[in-house]
Every structure is written in C-alpha cells, then in structure tokens.
Amino acid sequence: FSEFDMDDSGYQDSPTILFGQNDVFNNMAGYNFSSVRFRVRGYSSESQDVYLAGVRMNDAITGYTPYSLWSGLNEATRSKESVNGAEVSDFGFGGYNGLTNIMPMASSVRTGWRGSVLTNSALYRLRLMLTYASGQLDNGWSYAFSASARLGGNDWIKGVFYRSFGYYGAVEKRFGEEHKLGFTFMAAPGERGAQNGSTQEVYDLMGDNMYNSNWGYYNGKVRNARVRKTHEPIAILKYDFTPESQKLSASATVLYRFGKNGYTALDWYDAPDPRPDYYRNLPSYFYMDNTDYNRRNFAKYAWAKEAWETDLPSTTHINWDRLYAVNSLNSTASGNRSKYVIEERRVDQNDLNFAVNAKWNPVKFLTVNGGLSYKWNRTEYYKILDDLLGGDYYVNIDQFAERDFAAYPTMIQNDLDYYLRNGAAQTLAQGDKYGYDYYAHVRRAEAWASGRFTFGGFEATVAGRLGYSKFWREGLLRKGLFPGLDDNGNPFTYNGEIITKYDQIDGRPITSKGESDKKDFLTGSGKINLGYFISGGHRIYADAAYITEAPTFNQAFISPRTRNTVMPDLKTIKTLTADINYAYSNSGYDVRVTGFYTSIKDRTDVMSFYDDSQNSFTNFAMSGIDERHVGVELGFKVPTPVPNLSLQGVFTYGQYIYTSNPTMYQTYDNSAEYVAGTYGVVIPYWKSHPVHKKNDDG
C-alpha cells in the first residue's frame, strides 16, 4: 500500500471510448465488466495499444495507456477505428490485444451543438459537457471545441472527492482536394482524493470494507492526505495527403505531451507513523491469542479495540491537529522544524512523437500500408515539499539511511553535493525539491508495413515490424548512500573510510548521480491474418503473430529513486499468439466465437517492500517470467420484438498460468548488497505451480 500509482497486478481501468466498435464481447468487457476488474484473455493492460491521430500513446515508462489525458472529452474523442486481438490495422502494427486509433481532429467531431448532464456516475455526482463542431465550411476551414466538468465524489467512501475538467480546441484547413492541415490542443486537468487499502483486521473493527485511512478532520472539515493532481496537455499537428486518384494517401503527425502529474502523501522524520492503520496503532499489536507473542498487554489491547470499534476520530483517522501541534512545539534556533509534512511525488513528462503513415492501392486486390515513428521522452521523477503543516522548515536527509548509518553524516544526505558545499544538510521551504530527482530517458523508433490481399471472399494480410528502443537513467542529485566517484575519479571517504559502494558482481562503483548504462534493444515482429467471408453475414478468420518487445524502463531499474543499477540479464519479451474465430453479423444479430492461445516469455518484474525476515527495506527483481494464456470467448447480441432493445451476453473460459520459475535478485535498498548469498541463484516457486515443482533434490 506504499504507492498510490502501484501496478495493481496489471489491471487498468479502460474507458468505454475504447470499446465503441462493432464487437459485442469487447463492448461488454470494456464497459460492463470494468467494475470487476476483468482482463480480456488474462492479459495485462499494457498489451493494449491506443493511438491518438496515428501516434502510439502507451506510456514510454510503464507501457500503460494514459487514458486520463483525454478523460471527459467524450465527443471530441468519439471518432475512432479499432481491431481485435492480433489483427493488423491500417494505422499501426499493434500487439496481441487489439489496437484503437482515436481521431481528435476538428473534422472528425460530429457537426453541431451537443450538451449533456449526468448525475449517476460511481466516481462523481455531476458531469457537465458542452461540444460544438462546425463541420467543413465552404472556405475549407473546420473548427471544434469541447469543455467538461466532473464534480463531487461518492457517498460510500469517506474522504474521496473528484474535481476534473476537460478542454479541447481544434482547427483544420483543407487546401484544394488533396491537402489538409489540422491542429488540436486538449487536456483534462483535475484532482481527486484517494482511497487507501487496509487490512482485514481494520475492516472488521470498523465494520466497513469501504474504510479509508487517508483522511481526517482539520478545522471541522474532511482533509485527505493523498490527492492526485494532474494537468498534462497534448498538442497535435497533423497533415493529410489524399489525392483524387485515391491510390496513394499519406499522413504525418507531430504530437507533444507535457505538464505535471503528482500525488501528495504524508512524510515524517523522528516521529511516530501518523497513519491510523499503522500496525502499531492496532489492537493486534498489543495482544494476540498466541503463546509465542511477546507483546501481551491486554489493557492497551482493550483500549485500542474500543477506540476503533467506536470510531474515535483521533484514532481511526489522521489526527491533523496533533501533527500541527507537534510541528509548532518543535522549536529550534532556526524556527519550528517540521516533523510532519505533506510531500508531492511528481512524474512530469516531456513526450515528443513523430509518425508518418501511408496507404497504397497499386491494384484492386492489393492494399499496402506502412509507417515510421519516433518517440523522444524525458520524464522527471522528483518530490517537492507541498505543506510544512505549521512548521517553518524541513531537513533534506534520509531517515531510513540514518537508522543504519547514523555514524556517517555524509551517507544520510539526500543531496550530498549540497552538504559538502555548505557543511550541513539542506533546509527546505515549501515548494523545494527534495528526496530524489532523476530523469528517465526513452528513445524509440519503429518501421512497419503490411500487405492485404483480397480474392472474392478470401482475405489475407501479412505484416512486419522492426523496432529500436533505448533507455537510461540520469540522476540529478548525488545521494549519500551511493555517491559513486568524485570529479577526479576517486571514491568518497568519511574520516578516512571509503563510503563509495561497489557492485558485488562487476565491481563497478554504484552511482546515484549522472547517467546510467544505456540499454538498447532491436526487435522484430510478424503477423498473418486469414479470413473468409461466407454469404449471409458469416465470416471465419484466424490470426497469428510472433512479437518481440523491449522491456519498459520501470521494469529495468532496481531502485531508480536511489541509484543507477539496472536489472541483470535484461532480455526482449517474446510473445507467440494465435486465435481462430467465427463471426456472424446480419439483421441486428451479432455473434463472435473465438479460441485463443498466447505464450509470453522473458518478462521481468521489479518491486520494493519491507522484508520482515531481513528487517530491512529491500528491492525484489525477477527475470525469466513465462506465461501461457489459453481460452475461448463468446459474445452475442440478439434483437427483441421491442424496437431498439436487444439481448446481449458474453462468456469466456480461460487458463492463465505461469510456465516457468523466475530467477530472483533481492538487494537491501540502503546498501545494494544482495540478500541471497549468491547472485541470481534464488528461484522462487509459484504457489500451486501447475508445471514446475521442486524435486527431491530441491
């Protein structure tokens, strides 16, 4: 529960805008099943590609699609094209879990005025939307604008609120019959209070599974400590070439994403954990019905139990008054030093994209599509001091490093260079950066092409893609735990003792400042789609693909907030997938039946957590994760005698399993030393693993 933006096991909410295609299964899976966190074919969310004006929008760092960038702009982003599974599209090679291209240009928005008011959403109490599009005027110009507001929260989770807005503006000019140039600018700024997961003990004590530990009363009002704040505008410049012959058409798009994305959280130093559901604040900390338990204090247990069961605000929620009081009483010569503050963890992207796509029809039975794309991304990760909570200043030191290295003042510094220049740790005012600050750099280039052949009712498509990816970390601060070498190439020392740490495997100094090794990957992929249209709306088709992809930045660095260490033995991810389908669409009836098989090899996963067995915060990295996804899908829509009313249903059955036991690397976060005695030999066995189990020799 330490990260507000945690992966959540590969699940990500998918808005209905992505599933407005003529496919019953995907429509229901994307909308009706989103509340139960359904994953199509068991795939993780980054496997779904989403394009904006021909530019792939999947996040350069995580691979996920940033749906929130256009959230609330439904009318402006309604026009789109989609394909399922491993099908090949006219606007991109895609992956193995479908591809959607949203067209947010002025001429793509439906002509006229549109407005709406909604009051029954699970996320907010009120939504207002207004959109206007001129359509193409006689002078060749088109323009459109849209605005929205979504306000309120919900009534069943206390402390949660939602304030989100959206704005969109686009102009487009047609020059003659062959050329068109358009510009679009849009964003969805907003903020929302978050809910936090807790433990079953807390839910039982409160009698409420919707309990939220993130809030408390301050000056008589509800205040949430964890608030997501975003404003990331997107600017798009798109050129289209459509000659009268229609044998050759092309488009070129430049897209730039920028702005800020952050969320707040409590931070503290030399003070008790302020979270109400921290384990030391619960009854079970004082007494458990266990003969081996060594903290038996029934009186404190009874007091804590009563406080929780009666919902005593100072116990069950953040006690803001106490935090302010502690800060105001911590007087020093420089003023009141805050022990509790609000931090904002920022992830600010600069993402520049260029894409060219072309379509060629040399003969009636052949269509050739292809394209080139390039992505330049620099994302800055850092923290800023958002609120001193009544104090005058905060100090930029690492309290977790201080626990292990209190005798080494240089090693507890978050900014060692500042300490060496000034002889003291940096004092912080509101708005200052602190803790960590680094760039994630990503460069990605891609070329793809496809050929579609049609003969009567038979259709065949073959496609290929070549890609190149490179990423690296650039630390902007020198952390005392991992100083690396000084400007003269010498190790750092304290009182004659070397404090520079060296990698246990390759012997190189571990650094936090400057550029890491640059990891690059060359990938190649191929697809084939075969289909046959039978009379009367019947169709059978099959898809197959072999896809290689580079790992993402966030699955490559073991602890990017502290150091430049890259996960050992990084490999491309290899996916082999195939499906066979029957579809029927006629007279209001729609049916699709699919059988699918997917094998994924060499995934990686990186996580950090406090390991009780080691009594330390650790980094846990796994490589060589293999998966298999096998199953069937059925979707149907049947008209009823009542006009505009149909019966819809879906069914799926699948087996999604791990087919390998990965290699694990576990390191102490404060020292980068390996927990396991030998590098890379510890293999965690999946619980109830259906394929690989330990033999008698282990």
Predicted regions and their residues:
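A beta-strand signature from Gram-negative outer-membrane beta-barrel systems
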Residues: 70-116, 127-129
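Transmembrane beta-barrel wall of Gram-negative outer-membrane proteins
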Residues: 119-152, 156-195, 227-245
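Acidic/polar loop-and-plug regions of large Gram-negative outer-membrane beta-barrel proteins
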Residues: 180-236, 262-343, 406-432, 606-609
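Outer-membrane beta-barrel transmembrane strands
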Residues: 221-265, 334-383, 428-459, 515-525, ...
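Signature of Gram-negative outer-membrane beta-barrel scaffolds
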Residues: 341, 367-535, 648, 684-685
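Gram-negative outer-membrane beta-barrel transporters
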Residues: 596-601, 618-698
